[in-house]
A protein has these predicted regions:
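Structured soluble/peripheral alpha/beta segments that form catalytic or ligand/cofactor-binding pockets
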Residues: 1-364
Length: 364
């Protein structure tokens, strides 16, 4: 059986053929500002979000997302949400979800310019400004790209025999410099840091096509990494889709998923969600005599939430009847990046990192 036949038989793939690029109007070598503009029309069945996170020099960690609907299982209508998480070095932790009317949401198509009430997320693939307020928390951050915009092939994961179901991803700023001011009840802080921005969208409920994914990004020494391992749902054969990008001194080292091996170690059952969690996830990238080993090792959880707990009323009853037990876990721990040449360790670096496990399916 040929490689082409094998690929055709797969029910979950990353779109990467010349025909895919042509159909989607994308270049295999460059990324255009419109790609970070609105990619859906906010219609029923679609979803989209713009995401930013930063590790700040004062020890704080911030996450901001502008989301057109939180209903990723069965998106039916525009129901915009601002998500703002802030972790402070003194141990205080804030998780905010603020819901807005559809009329308060807008997103430009030619570049990133998303407005949600008085909040704004705007940029041009190189420099972004994120302004967000949720109750007593507010942040105003500027993100300037250091690692160039990147996407895994076209960025589109396609599902089904006809490949009509899509989930797409654009890491517009794999790593950038951040200047930020944030306040808690008027207590203002100004600092700098390292940040990241990406953009997701799709036309099918994620729980229909994805069983689970690990997603991570981080920086250690001269290295920047984005690493994800997506497992398609049972209907699509639990097909794995590895995603990997490694840069050194802001220059791409490698991003060929065929050269990546993914491993889970120290698997335990999370008590709150009942999901199997790997204490360590490891991505090994082999290219000729060079081998890069990227490991994420958990020290504690930032959050561990059952998705049904955020669903209310009739939707909650329906979710229970469907035995839906999806979960979202976010971890803090150590990122270690080591480079070997001909089997000999050349260099190794370690740094703090944040990563996540999104688990839509039943534990397996």
């Amino acid at each position: 059986m040929t490689g082409k036949t094998l690929m055709a038989d797969k029910l979950a793939v990353m779109a990467d053929s010349p025909a895919d690029y042509q159909r989607l109007g994308l270049s295999p070598t460059t990324i255009a500002p419109w790609e970070d503009g609105a990619r859906t029309d906010d219609s029923a069945g679609t979803y989209e979000w713009w995401y930013f996170d930063a590790h700040l020099a004062d020890g704080a960690k911030v996450v901001v997302s502008f989301i057109n609907t939180m209903d990723l299982a069965e998106p039916k209508s525009l129901a915009p949400v601002l998500r703002l998480n802030l972790d402070l070095p003194d141990g205080r932790h804030f998780e905010k979800l603020v819901h807005y009317q559809p009329s308060e949401w807008s997103a430009a198509k030619d570049h990133a310019d998303v407005r949600l009430g008085t909040n704004r997320f705007t940029g041009d693939l190189h420099q972004y400004r994120i302004q967000a307020t949720a109750e007593e928390i507010s942040i105003d951050a500027t993100l300037t790209g250091e690692v160039p915009p990147w996407r895994p092939s076209t960025g589109y994961m396609l599902f089904g025999a006809d490949r009509s179901m899509e989930f797409a991803w654009l890491p517009s700023v794999p790593q950038g410099a951040v200047t930020a001011s944030y306040s808690i009840n008027g207590e203002k802080h100004e600092t700098t840091g390292v940040g990241y921005h990406d953009h997701n969208w799709g036309n099918v409920g994620l729980m229909k096509v994805v069983h689970d994914w690990y997603w991570a990004r981080g920086q250690a020494g001269p290295y920047t990494v984005i690493a994800s391992y997506v497992t398609a749902s049972e209907k699509f054969g639990f097909e794995p889709i590895p995603i990997f990008m490694l840069a050194r001194n802001n220059v791409l080292v490698g991003d060929d998923p065929a050269k990546v091996t993914f491993e889970r170690e120290g698997i335990y059952t999370d008590q709150k969600t009942g999901k199997p969690v790997a204490a360590t996830t490891r991505y090994t990238y082999r290219d000729g005599e060079n081998r890069h080993v990227v490991s994420f090792t958990r020290t504690h959880d930032l959050s561990a939430n059952r998705m049904i707990d955020s669903v209310k009323g009739v939707k909650r009853i329906a979710a229970r009847l469907m035995h839906f037990d999806g979960a979202y876990l976010r971890f803090v721990g150590d990122l270690q990046i080591s480079r070997y040449r001909s089997g000999e360790l050349v260099e190794t670096y370690k740094e703090d990192a944040i990563w996540e496990l999104m688990y839509f399916g039943h534990a397996r």
